[in-house]
Structures are given as C-alpha cells and as structure tokens.
Amino acid sequence: MAAMATPQQCWLPTRARAPPPPPPRAPSSASPVSGAPASLRFRGRRAASASASAARRRRGASLPCSPRCALETAGPGFDPLGLYNDGPSRNDTQSPLSNFFGVLSPVFGSSSGGRKEKSYGRGAAAAIEDSSIDIGDFFKGPLPGKFLKLLGYLALSRLGIYIPLGGVNRDAFAGNLDQNSLLGTLDSFSGGGIGRLGICSLGIVPFINAQIVFQLLAQLYPKLQDLQKKEGEAGRKKVLQYTRYASVGFAIVQAIGQVLFLRPYVNDFSTEWVLTSVTLLTLGSVFTTFIGERISDLKLGNGTSLLIFTSIISYLPASFGRTVAQAFQDGNYVGLLTIILSFLFLVLGIVYVQEAERKIPLNYASRYSSRSGGLQRSAYLPFKVNSSGVMPIIFSTSSLALPGTLARFTGLEFLKKAAISLNPGGALYIPTNVLLIAFFNYYYTFLQLDPDDLSEQLKRQGASIPLVRPGKSTAAFIKTVLSNISVLGSAFLAVLAAGPSVVEQITHLTAFRGFAGTSVLILVGCATDTARKVQAEIISQKYKNIEFYDVNRFDQ
C-alpha cells in the first residue's frame, strides 16, 4: 500500500506533484521538479529549497537561516506573492483580505529573487485611478491660459452688441420686437443684439445658414461629399473655406433685409446710411464668425454653440424679469409657478436624455481571456440618443427666419404671408418646425456617424458586433440602430420646440417666449460638452506623466 504523502510534499498541484524528498545524507542531489511538466520548471530552484527546508525540519536541525530561508520555512500556507494560486488552496482558513491580495498579486507582484515583473495591465489601471479630478488639476497645464483666451473672445463678441447703428428710433423698434415672436427668439440667440441694434446683431446666423446650404449641397453633388469625407482634414478645410465665403454672402443679404426692415424707424433713410449700415452689419457678422473659429481652436467646445450659449445667458435675466413683471401685473401667479416648474422639469429631462446612450457590445479577436476561456466583452460602441445636439434646432430656427428675411428684401406678398404663418403662434409654425427638426436631426446624425465608415474601422481594428457579420451586415445593423435613435431624438427635440407654445397657451404669459426649450437645450448641451472637454484635457495631461511599464512607481 502506497504511503500517504506528507503536507510538505503536497505544496505542488496534484496533477504535477513532485517526487518525495531525497534522503538526509544527500539533500542537494535531488530535483523536486524532475517529473513536472515544462510549465512548472521555472519553480525548480524554489522547490528544491523548500524540500531541503522540509528535510531539516523533520531532522530537527537548528541550522542558521537567512531571511529568505525563514520565509521558506514559514509553513505550507505561506504564499505572500500568490505564486501558487493556480493549484488547490493550501490554507482554507485564509481571510477575505488575503484572498483579495492573492488575486491582485499575479498582476502587481514580484517573482522570486526580488526582481520586478513588467506589468502590461498596470498602465491603464493607473490612468483610470489617477483620472479623479480636483481643483488643483485645473490649474496645471495649459487650461488656465485657454480659459483666459475663451473669456477674452467671448467678451469681444459681446462688445459688438453694445455698439449701435446710428439714426434709428430704438424705442419704437423695441415695441415692435416684443410683438414678433420669431424675432424675439433670434434676439435671444444674439444676446439682445437685434433689440439693441448692435453692429454684431446678425451674430453667427449667416455662418449657420451657409453650413446648412453646404450640407444640403453635399447630398446633391458627390464631388463635394467626397471632398468632405474622403480627402480627410485637407478636404474639410476646403469646405470650411467655401462656407466662410458663402457666409459673407448670407451676411450681406441678411444685412440688407434688416436695414430695409428698419426703414420705418430710421430718422433719415438715405443711400449713404444704407451702405454704411450694411457694411457694419456684414463686418460684425464676419468678426463674430472669426471669434467662433478661434474658440473652436481652443478645443473647449464648439465655437458656434458657445457664442449662442453666452448670448442666451446674457438674455436670460431680462427675459425672466419681463415674465415675472407680466405675471404680477396680471395677477397670474399660477401661470408663473407653472412656468417655473416646467423650466425645472425641462432641465431634468434634457440632462437625462443628453446623457442617455445605446451601448453596442464589441468583441476584439486580439483580446482573449484565458481565465474566462472566451472573448472579453468590456468594450462597447456608444451611440447618444441625441447625438446631433442642438444643431437641428438652430438649423430649423434659421430656416424659419429665411422667409421673413426674403419678404423684407423682395416685398413679395406670398412671402409675407408665409413669414406670418411660420411665426410662433402661426398655423404652420409647429408642424413645419417639427418636420424641419426631424429632417435635420436625421441628416446630421448620419453626417456625423457614417455606418459604412464605422463598419470599415471596426473591421480594421479586429472588432465585431456579436451575432453580426463584419462588413455590409455590420453597416446595415449600425444604420438601423442610428435610424431608431434618430426617431427618439427627433421626438425629444420636437417636444422641446413645441412645448413652450403649449405652456404659453396654458399660462397666457408671452414675455417668456424668447427663452424657450431650445435655449435650455443649448445651455445644457454646451455646459455638458465643455465640462467633458475640460475633463478630457485634464486626463490627457495625466496620461502624459504616466509611465505605463514603470512598476517601481506603484509597488511602493
């Protein structure tokens, strides 16, 4: 009958157990791993030392022992580095804390002899651990300088609002502005520039109109679309340059329309005054567009959105003050409370939808987990529910303003009727606005995310969507997902656009019309986008200081 193995002989796994130790008279001539497989031969020196120590304990010898020897003779359950955790546990009474460090030790631990192992997973973990942000991180790197430049650019853009055109009766014009809902909305986008008749009152609107035109032309002319997508950064710069030229033309047309609209309020309407006013308004629009591009270069957010964000913030106190004054004048306290509650729920809903996303899991062929025996599925492809942001609403508002501008420029009767119908409160305002928002949202979503390009990128990276074949099937799947998401996003934006009109009819308060759900969406969207850009900038600075293979830094 075979003798039962002693505990000192069972420190190796059962499937590759070492032979019994040699006789005491020849302890150095044995090799405890002579019958072990190749995967365990790197433990040979340590196994021999452990066998010799066990033999000395059986003989009761009291030989001098080094610190390393003391660690080896500490008992069969002593394994601080977790070198033998692939076999059966030798100590079932270990604490949960010991088990936790035993799991972490193969990643961060050292091999025998005190030599540090190079950890390939520690760099990413360190970057994630160091991604926490405090106030001190904000003042490191180029962020303070970028924010000072941003504040300077925004102050310059606001300066042109307070430089007025000469020879206009502002009081009479302000009274007409309160009665025109669409002009009130555009006035909120310009930060009160239209009401003050500033030289920068056109703002960024001509540039937005030029962007709309070129995005539509890209669908009609394949060469323009190839220039925008296939030629990379150089092609996009060319399209941007063409958009700038077109924005100057739109600025001239809109400036002429605004000057003709101001004719009843001008004291001395002459050709000289018209030329001077058109030139000043056009230069003001070009200057605002230039500032928007400089803000975009700072990579702290979209320059166009930040300019509109600043304008809305500056317009908010006056708009809310008029609403409160009208409510107290009419004694409509219930309507005022309804508007305040609607505003709070609107902000919460916008934040919820803006942060919502559809996550599509991805499989990477190069990421095979030997422990789980399959592909890792930690990566995913995120799609925002409202991936187009505030741009569809801005495009829709600018499109609704075009008939009024053309009517003032041409004086055609059918354009005047169309402009009246497309004003907030008109018969065609809500359905036309909803349709335009749905169209621009669908178009802008696929302009930002091309399913064919995404499918090709995933294929090059060795990634695939579970149960979906790479190539055309992946592109079709992504297109279906984006189409479904765009429907939800369009419904959300349509509620934002039409909701204020419904609240206005319920509360009978019209002074708050210029600051609608569109404005709240722009505020929340720009604020969250800028916060993400700042966080990404801070984390990128931390990545620059991380040595991904410097284990000595993390083992202290």
From Swiss-Prot:
The alphabetical list of record keywords is: Chloroplast, Membrane, Plastid, Protein transport, Thylakoid, Transit peptide, Translocation, Transmembrane, Transmembrane helix, Transport
A Pfam family cross-referenced in the UniProt record is SecY
Q: Which GO terms describe its molecular function?
A: protein transmembrane transporter activity; signal sequence binding
One cellular component term (GO) for this entry is: chloroplast thylakoid membrane
Disulfide bond annotation, renumbered to this chain: none
The entry's localization annotation reads: Plastid, Chloroplast thylakoid membrane
Has UniProt tagged this entry with the keyword RNA-binding?
A: no
| HAMAP family xrefs | SecY
Subunit (UniProt): Component of the plastid Sec protein translocase complex, which is composed of at least SECY and SECE.
- Could you tell me which NCBIfam families the record lists for this protein? 3a0501s007 (TIGR00967)
Annotated function: The central subunit of the protein translocation channel SecYE. Consists of two halves formed by TMs 1-5 and 6-10. These two domains form a lateral gate at the front which open onto the bilayer between TMs 2 and 7, and are clamped together by SecE at the back. The channel is closed by both a pore ring composed of hydrophobic SecY resides and a short helix (helix 2A) on the extracellular side of the membrane which forms a plug.
Name listed for the protein in its UniProt record: Preprotein translocase subunit SECY, chloroplastic
What organism is the protein native to?
Oryza sativa subsp. japonica
Gene name of the record: SECY
